[in-house]
């Protein structure tokens, strides 16, 4: 079974410059992808197997390398170390970070670049951005986004973690669940209730909380189905005291800030999934070409050809939908429905690709040292995280319904 020992090749950027203009990328995007591909191939992928086995990767070491490359600087203010580049650069980076040989590190990186820092970059005070944003852009600090709770996942308005005023400080109590980077993070962007107002969409604030604060406790890393080397914990806040100036932007606007960045988070998730799913298909074709069964290779079987062809077509359609959505977003259009469609599609396609490719590999695909097995475990989260499939369908139908009402 020599195929099990085959060295996985790092995928190059999904697209390269040519005489045909790319839909959303230009030369700087390709240059960033090439630089990132080189770093992943030389510094990250050689260590992935060991990090996955140990259940932890060195976030500060990896983030510092990525920070020096400018991965965390996109869409961030130049005054705080950002590059101010467009959202298409975020997608170019997210797409290329998918070349990492596991889902754990891309997810962890995207938390810092596209989840914990956007609201801070846009609405935070100068002092907050100097304290938390600048070193996060440089890769000196690792951050988490802390929104979900044990009883509040899709229903963000139902969170119970609260903060009460004590002079010029906030006293925070509650807990947060499924916190990516939580065991290694230096600080977290935390959504808390800051008033008892009945309007659950206007009583919440985003607060920067240093995770070495007195009263912050972390669970042992959670034992997950996939994303093994990404540390995920439950955070507990027991009378945690921070300055009220650590509130990002306006008090009571936290829910709105969080909702506004969900679209970008979801598009980044779609981008991250493209290369790994392409890799699953490509590696399965290689294996099927070598594997003999009943005197023929698996790839000679028409049903295998049809299955792989369909997966390729669906992946290309998803890629095209992503690019169309990003282009519309960069032009200022409302892309809530398109984003929900793309996010729904990548989640379902991830399950389909990894399941059907694993089926072609058979027993060999069931072994943990096979990349197909890891992909099967890692990318199941795409239908759950950043908005589950059911929420995406609600968003799509809401837009459908409004559209039809206008026609009546």
UniProtKB/Swiss-Prot annotation:
GO biological process: one example: L-leucine catabolic process
SUPFAM superfamilies attached to this UniProt entry: Acyl-CoA dehydrogenase C-terminal domain-like, Acyl-CoA dehydrogenase NM domain-like
E.C. numbers: 1.3.8.4
GO molecular function: 3-methylbutanoyl-CoA dehydrogenase activity; acyl-CoA dehydrogenase activity; flavin adenine dinucleotide binding
Disulfide bonds: none
Active-site positions on this chain: 265
GO terms for cellular component: cytoplasm; intracellular membrane-bounded organelle
Pathways per UniProt: Amino-acid degradation; L-leucine degradation; (S)-3-hydroxy-3-methylglutaryl-CoA from 3-isovaleryl-CoA: step 1/3
Catalysed conversion reaction: 3-methylbutanoyl-CoA + oxidized [electron-transfer flavoprotein] + H(+) = 3-methylbut-2-enoyl-CoA + reduced [electron-transfer flavoprotein]
Gene3D superfamilies registered for this protein in UniProt: Acyl-CoA dehydrogenase/oxidase, N-terminal domain, Butyryl-CoA Dehydrogenase, subunit A, domain 2, Butyryl-CoA Dehydrogenase, subunit A, domain 3
Enzyme class: oxidoreductase
Top-rank taxon: Eukaryota
Cofactor needs: FAD
Keywords, sorted A to Z: FAD, Flavoprotein, Oxidoreductase
Family: Belongs to the acyl-CoA dehydrogenase family.
Subunit relationships: Homotetramer.
Protein name, UniProt field: Probable acyl-CoA dehydrogenase 6
Organism: Caenorhabditis elegans
Organism placement in taxonomy: Eukaryota, Metazoa, Ecdysozoa, Nematoda, Chromadorea
Gene giving rise to this polypeptide: acdh-6
